A protein has these predicted regions:
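Divalent metal-cofactor coordination and adjacent catalytic microenvironments
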Residues: 1-161
């Protein structure tokens, strides 16, 4: 199924249980596990609300197909072939994108092919960030129906503390 999955989650949270204890004047008797769970759930809530990764993590984004370019309806007759044009980029969710690890495609026999990094570049000057094909390059063809392209990338503002 196409979607976004976490490959490697954050190694530590933005604040520690001791910081919370000190700020909220909580006794040492309260379990650290409870406080750590509250910190993690708070971070996840903020990330889901914002649609962003606050701390660096590795994500895998799988898609079923590359969208086609929207073309306006044509009135009258047109001379030339009727063809579809694929977009030259893939938008990546959960900004900010730090780096792309790899872009892979899968054919009907589930054979994995890694797209050479010289064939695309990361455009993270805009949001959402996107992978853009270089001039003269095309997306792989003869792909399977589901999860045809997989992008693994690092997203987030940096490590905790």
């Amino acid at each position: 199924m196409a979607g976004l999955t976490i490959v490697a989650d954050v190694s530590e949270e933005p604040i520690s249980a001791d910081n919370v204890r000190e700020y909220a004047h909580i006794d040492d008797g309260v379990e650290t596990t409870v406080i750590n769970n509250m910190i993690k759930s708070s971070r996840l809530y903020v990330e889901n609300y914002l649609g962003r990764s606050l701390l660096n993590r590795t994500l895998k984004y799988s898609i079923d197909y590359v969208d086609e370019v929207d073309q306006p309806l044509w009135e009258g007759t047109r001379i030339g072939p009727d063809m579809t044009i694929r977009r030259r980029y893939l938008q990546l969710p959960r900004p900010p994108v730090v780096s792309v690890t790899h872009v892979k495609s899968f054919d009907d026999a589930d054979t994995e092919t890694t797209l050479a990094s010289s064939k695309y570049y990361l455009d993270n000057q805009r949001e959402p960030a996107r992978i853009v094909l270089r001039n003269g390059e095309t997306w792989p063809t003869a792909l399977r129906v589901a999860n045809t392209i997989e992008v693994t990338y690092v997203s987030g503002y940096g490590a905790a503390r």
